[in-house]
């Protein structure tokens, strides 16, 4: 599974990195972000593109798996 580590990055970088990873992915990707609004934006983006997004909150970060 490809991983995008966008922790500590400012918007719109996490979304741009996620979009690029999805474009080049052959399977699920995992995205790590540190802000709640980034998690929300990435989940919405994934769903708008027809993908399933599942998120988990970990200590001071969020993990989103996009399938």
Predicted regions and their residues:
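Intrinsic-disorder/low-complexity, polar/charged segments enriched in Ser/Thr/Lys/Arg/Asp/Glu/Gln
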Residues: 1, 28-30, 61
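A generic structural motif
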Residues: 26, 37, 59-61
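C-terminal structural segments of small proteins and small subunits
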Residues: 41-67
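An N-terminal amphipathic alpha-helical segment
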Residues: 1-25
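Amphipathic alpha-helical interaction surfaces in cytosolic regulatory modules
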Residues: 13-20, 36-49
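Short glycine-rich, basic-tinged beta-strand/loop micro-motifs
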Residues: 22-34
């Amino acid at each position: 599974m490809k991983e995008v580590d966008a922790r500590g990055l400012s918007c719109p970088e996490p979304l741009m990195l996620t979009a690029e990873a999805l474009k080049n992915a052959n399977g699920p990707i995992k995205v790590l972000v540190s802000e709640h609004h980034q998690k929300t934006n990435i989940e919405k983006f994934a769903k708008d593109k027809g993908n399933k997004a599942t998120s988990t909150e970990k200590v001071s970060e969020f993990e989103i798996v996009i399938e």
